[in-house]
């Protein structure tokens, strides 16, 4: 199975303060899923694997070699899953890698780091700048400047240039994600 998602947004921001900003935002994602099957001791087992990629590119980004890499990754994952065993239960250390685990991080704490929730005092992070909010070694960034990544933009929807924002550094809360309104109300710069 394969899925292709593509969009091409052209954005113009015209603010009341006279700011004019524009951005072109292509976005593509190709996903490949395979199902592998094996019979072991008379028991049929089926497992899935997936591969894919994309970013802020046009459709020409995908070539035959890249497509083959995605298929190979999906096949490898499915075959690896055929050999898997149930995960142990209980409390354990979890290590998140780069990429899609960032969505888990975003949902778990990202919304709580938004300026409006903190200004209103409805976030667990409200009033905690400068305090330890995560384990030592944990750094969380909001970085819209990483070239060609899904979350990368030249300007945000308010016409502000994208930037690299350190939210948590070595476990210490450094700041919040700020739109223009909440930044002004909190006396800080928009992020």
Language-model segments: residues:
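C-terminal, non-catalytic macromolecule-binding modules
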Residues: 170-191
């Amino acid at each position: 199975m394969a899925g292709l998602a593509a969009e091409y947004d052209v954005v113009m921001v015209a603010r009341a303060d006279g700011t004019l900003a524009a951005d072109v935002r292509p976005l593509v994602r190709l996903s490949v899923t395979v199902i592998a099957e094996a019979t072991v001791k008379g028991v049929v087992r089926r497992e899935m694997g997936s591969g894919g990629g994309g970013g802020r590119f046009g459709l020409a980004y995908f070539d035959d070699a890249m497509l083959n890499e995605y298929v190979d990754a999906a096949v490898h994952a499915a075959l690896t899953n055929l050999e898997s065993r149930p995960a142990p239960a209980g409390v354990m250390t979890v290590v998140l890698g780069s990429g899609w685990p960032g969505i888990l991080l975003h949902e778990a704490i990202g919304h709580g780091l938004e300026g409006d929730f903190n200004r209103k005092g409805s976030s667990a992070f409200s009033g905690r700048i400068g305090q330890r909010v995560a384990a030592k070694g944990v750094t969380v960034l909001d970085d819209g400047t990483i070239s060609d990544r899904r979350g990368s933009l030249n300007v945000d929807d308010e016409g502000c240039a994208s930037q690299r924002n350190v939210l948590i550094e070595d476990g210490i809360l450094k700041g919040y994600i700020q739109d223009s309104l909440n930044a002004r109300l909190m006396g800080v710069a928009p992020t």
